[in-house]
A protein has these predicted regions:
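Flexible, acidic/Gly-rich N-terminal and inter-domain linker regions that tether
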Residues: 1-46, 354-363
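Auxiliary Fe-S-binding modules of radical SAM enzymes
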Residues: 1-10, 78, 210, 217-363
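Glycine-rich, proline-tolerant flexible connector loops at the mouths of alpha/beta enzymes
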Residues: 4-5, 31-37, 58, 86-98, ...
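Active-site cofactor/substrate anionic-group-binding motifs, chiefly glycine-
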Residues: 22-79
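Mobile, glycine- and charge-enriched loop segments
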Residues: 28-29, 44, 50-54, 59, ...
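Hydrophobic faces of well-ordered beta-strands that scaffold small-molecule active sites
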Residues: 29-35, 85, 116-120, 150-152, ...
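Short loop/turn motifs at secondary-structure junctions
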Residues: 46, 81-83, 146-149, 187-189, ...
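Conserved Radical SAM active-site core
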Residues: 54-214
Length: 363
């Protein structure tokens, strides 16, 4: 906690940068070309920070993509040099294992070279509940249908005090970790995430990182576990959470950054860019058993994302051909010129860009 709270950013950056070069010795920074496709916006979880979802009782707002909708999206992605769909959606009350197996198989039949980085622990837990299966059985069947890797979606902060208020219908912290543990025991490659800057404390951020580190220590020998960690600040614009705060209707003990309970905390004196950089740096230091740290530039902008390459990050993520969920809550940093813009930012930061696949191998 002292490092996070008190150490000057320049000193913290130097420590994290040294750790980065221990994991990735070369002065190179990876990136990926993929497409984020949200297959449905129907969701039971009703997260207080999400502007994208609609409730099952809102048919006028609901959508689910038809299979034919995927084909032009895949074609456009391939034309831009991409090879992977980041496929995510809501916790749809009617979609069990059969629906996902059918979708995955049809996608792989239509485009055999396509990589599916799909769903996340909340969806896996939801499918298990709907289909009355174990987490392991769901993962085994989805892998057989075409699932390649499992994103770290839905982690937010792995502390149940936070989760019960923000997203009470989502899996608990332990359930999220249990899904990932099963994926790791199956030898799957996954990622881990953290969304900060809402009702959590700095201590809870550290506890989140420690929980990830402990799970990574438990992965079977020779398996990747978490290949990468990604963090970003929550986008509050227009969310139910911000509306509750503005109306003075947050429960006792629940505060947002900048409110009275935070004023004694050094983080409320950090500029948003410094808070992001400090969080990336502390993640690099805590997660010494995770190979890669990604600079999630979508919510902080490309300039700040590139600065993160000097505080422990070694990957710039995707060019983001399509993104809906975070953008619906206020993020507006999608690239207009795609790969060239991202490569230029990496080079300007003093690194050599290289295009990777989902397993951090050159393409």
């Amino acid at each position: 906690m002292r490092l996070y709270r008190e150490v000057p950013l320049e000193e913290l950056s130097g420590m994290a940068d040294a750790e980065r070069f221990r994991h990735v010795p070369e002065r190179r920074v990876s990136y990926q070309i993929d497409r984020n496709v949200n297959y449905t916006n129907v969701c039971l979880s009703a997260c207080k920070f999400c502007n994208f979802h609609c409730r099952p009782d809102q048919p006028e707002k609901a959508y689910t993509l038809d299979f034919e909708d995927y084909l032009p999206k895949i074609a456009e992605m391939k034309a831009l040099g991409g090879d992977q769909l980041l496929l995510q959606g809501g916790l749809h009350p009617k979609y069990g294992i059969d629906w996902y197996e059918t979708l995955f198989r049809r996608l792989k039949e239509a485009e055999p070279s396509l990589k599916l980085n799909a769903l996340g622990p909340p969806e896996i837990a939801h499918i298990a509940r709907v289909s009355k299966l174990s987490y392991r059985d769901v993962l085994v069947r989805l892998r057989a249908a075409g699932l390649d890797t499992l994103p770290g979606a839905g982690a937010e902060i792995l502390v149940d005090r936070v989760r019960k208020f923000l997203s009470p219908a989502k899996p608990t912290a332990q359930q999220w970790l249990d899904v990932m543990g099963e994926a790791h025991r199956l030898g799957m490659s996954t990622t881990a995430t953290m969304v900060y800057g809402h009702i959590e404390t700095l201590e809870e951020r550290i506890n989140h990182l420690l929980a990830l580190r402990a799970l990574q220590d438990c992965r079977p020998a020779g398996t990747p576990g978490f290949r990468a960690f990604i963090c970003w600040p929550m986008q509050l614009t227009g969310t139910e959470l911000l509306r509750l705060a503005d109306a003075g209707r947050l429960p006792a003990g629940i505060t947002l950054p900048g409110e009275p309970a935070w004023q004694a905390d050094p983080s409320c004196r950090w500029r948003p860019d410094e808070e992001f950089l400090r969080t990336v740096a502390i993640a690099r230091l805590v997660l010494d058993n995770v190979d890669h740290i990604q600079a999630s530039w979508l919510t902080v902008g490309l300039d700040t994302g590139a600065r993160a390459l000097h505080v422990g990050a070694d990957d710039m993520g995707s060019i983001m051909i399509e993104e809906n969920v975070v953008s619906a809550a206020g993020a507006r940093h999608l690239l207009q010129e795609g790969e060239r813009t991202l490569r230029t930012a990496i080079e300007a930061a003093g690194f050599t860009p290289w295009l990777r696949d989902q397993c951090y191998q050159p393409r």
